[in-house]
Structures are given as C-alpha cells and as structure tokens.
C-alpha cells in the first residue's frame, strides 16, 4: 500500500514539473502583440516599443507592442 502511495506522489511531482517547464517556455509575447504590462517579455529578436497617445491634446494612454528590432515607424501625413 505504501508503495502505491509513494509511486502516485512521484508521478504527481513529475507531471507538475513538466507542466511548469511548458508554462515557462510559453511566456514570451509574439510579434505585434501588446506588451504594455510586461515590456521585457517579447520573444527573441523583438523589442517592446511604446508610444504616447493623445486625443485633443490630452494624453490618453501609452500602448506598447512587440515589434521587430531596428525597424522605425514614421507617421504618414
């Protein structure tokens, strides 16, 4: 009986470790997704770029998105 309980606990621990590894591997934010709350979690070779948003001269937010490195966006007039 003790062997069955011990085996169950060991299997539970192994499954928990595997799930934790999978979750830690999925934490990066992909290209063009919002990164306002976690600016340092964009995937490899991607930066979190933020810009100030104004409506009628009043700042209404600071949205951030994961964008490609060394890419510059310009405003189209």
Swiss-Prot record:
Localization (cell): Secreted
PTMs per UniProt: Contains 4 disulfide bonds.
Propeptide position ranges: 21-26
Main subcellular location: secreted
CDD domains referenced in this protein's UniProt entry, alphabetically: Spider_toxin (cd12960)
Tissue: Expressed by the venom gland.
Gene Ontology, cellular component aspect: extracellular region
Pfam families with a match to the protein in the record: Toxin_35
Leader peptide range in chain numbering: 1-20
Source organism, top-level taxon: Eukaryota
UniProt KW keywords: Disulfide bond, Secreted, Signal, Toxin
GO molecular function terms attached to this record: ion channel inhibitor activity; toxin activity
Family in the record: Belongs to the neurotoxin 19 (CSTX) family. 09 (U10-Lctx) subfamily.
Name recorded for this polypeptide: U10-lycotoxin-Ls1c
The organism of origin for this protein: Lycosa singoriensis
């Amino acid at each position: 009986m003790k062997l069955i309980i011990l085996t169950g606990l060991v299997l539970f621990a192994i499954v928990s470790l595997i799930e934790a590894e999978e979750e830690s591997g999925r934490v990066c934010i992909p290209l063009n997704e919002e990164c306002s709350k976690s600016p340092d979690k964009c995937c490899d070779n991607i930066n979190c770029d933020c810009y100030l948003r104004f409506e009628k001269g009043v700042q209404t937010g600071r949205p951030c998105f994961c964008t490609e490195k060394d890419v510059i966006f310009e405003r189209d007039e």
